[in-house]
């Protein structure tokens, strides 16, 4: 299965597994592949949900298109994909958004941006230019609550702090106007956590994260 950094969506009794297709190499020159299953054991390749050549040129070839996650918006009846987009030096660090009419796509790329611009004490030397462009967006996940509201969890501030951002009604961007503590929040401040996995169980919210050690293993943490 070529679907790295996977995100799984359950829709009408079918599981859809989205992830990076690295058949042509580590830089994911193909795009985001999707597989389907009814039992989480037998998987069928449905094709490429988001082709790499459909994202802006700087993210093709040696650029980064990863961590794709998909939600179904029952209001718009659209499938919405969020992903981490970056250049090879990991300096662009932005969120990409695409939509589709069907879970297997094809997804149409909409835009990329950094959802929050907040002065956390910008470093004097910052290769990601957060002061001008907004705070970085890297390893991420999506979460939809029981009330239908959706949220993006992601590593920001050059991976030092994690953000939670409530999405708009269409799930295609942050809820506006942005207000810290109301529509978005800083969590795990200065703890360098990434790969967030949020879920809700018995009325409580849980978040599992990884430390930022690259490909080296580390202990998972939970909150």
Protein language model features and the residues they cover:
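Carbohydrate-active catalytic/glycan-binding domains of CAZyme proteins
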Residues: 1-223
């Amino acid at each position: 299965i070529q679907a790295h950094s996977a995100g799984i969506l359950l829709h009408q009794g079918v599981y859809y597994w989205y992830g990076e297709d690295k058949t042509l190499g580590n830089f994911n020159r193909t795009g985001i592949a999707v597989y389907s299953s009814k039992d989480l054991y037998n998987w069928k390749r449905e094709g490429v949900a988001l082709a790499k050549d459909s994202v802006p040129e700087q993210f093709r070839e040696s650029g980064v298109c990863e961590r794709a996650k998909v939600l179904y918006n029952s209001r718009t009846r659209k499938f919405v994909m969020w992903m981490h987009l970056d250049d090879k030096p990991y300096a662009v660090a932005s969120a990409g958004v695409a939509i589709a009419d069907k879970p297997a796509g094809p997804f149409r790329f909409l835009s990329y941006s950094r959802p929050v611009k907040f002065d956390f004490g910008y470093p004097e030397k910052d290769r990601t230019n957060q002061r001008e462009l907004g705070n970085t967006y890297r390893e991420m996940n999506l979460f939809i609550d029981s009330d239908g509201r959706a949220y993006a969890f992601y590593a920001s501030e050059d991976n030092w702090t994690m953000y939670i951002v409530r999405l708009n009604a269409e799930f295609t961007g942050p809820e506006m106007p942005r207000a810290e503590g109301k529509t978005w929040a800083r969590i795990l401040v200065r703890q360098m956590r990434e790969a967030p996995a949020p879920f809700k169980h018995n009325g409580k919210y849980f978040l599992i994260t990884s430390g930022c050690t690259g490909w080296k293993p580390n202990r998972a943490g939970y909150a």
